[in-house]
A protein has these predicted regions:
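A short loop-to-beta-strand structural motif that recurs across blades of beta-propeller domains
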Residues: 3-7, 47-51, 91-95
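Beta-rich catalytic cores
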Residues: 27, 71
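Short loop/turn motifs that cap or connect beta-strands within the blades
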Residues: 17-23, 61-67, 105-107
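Conserved Ser/Thr-centered positions that define the repeating blades of beta-propeller domains
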Residues: 8-9, 34, 52-53, 78, ...
Length: 107
């Protein structure tokens, strides 16, 4: 069975489940958030990466590596959410400098 992803918009006083992949059973590997919680990123072991620019209300799948054949190991973002990093198993790291709008291989 997959895992669930939860977000808090009040400093952890309460939590709500969010479903980036709909009702699919996903094993989540990593997650990141901007300081204000508006920008979110969730990395799945099955090779999918999701971004929200609406505090988790809506999610969009993105493929920085061009395909979903490698599991994501780590993701991170700057405090304002503009700069995002995502790394896949095997050592490649991808960078976005426009809130996840486009990606390039960083190293």
């Amino acid at each position: 069975k997959g895992q669930r992803l939860y977000i808090s918009i009040n400093g952890g006083s309460s939590w709500n489940e969010t479903q980036p992949a709909g009702n699919n059973d996903i094993t989540w590997q990593a997650a990141a958030a901007s300081n204000d919680g508006k920008y979110l990123m969730a990395a799945a072991k099955d090779g999918r990466l999701y971004i929200s620019t609406t505090s988790g209300t809506n999610w969009q799948e993105t493929q920085p590596a061009g395909n979903a054949d490698q599991p994501w190991q780590i993701c991170s973002m700057s405090g304002d959410g503009k700069i995002m990093l995502a790394g896949i198993y095997g050592g490649r790291v991808y960078l976005s400098t426009n809130y996840g709008g486009s990606w390039k291989e960083a190293f």
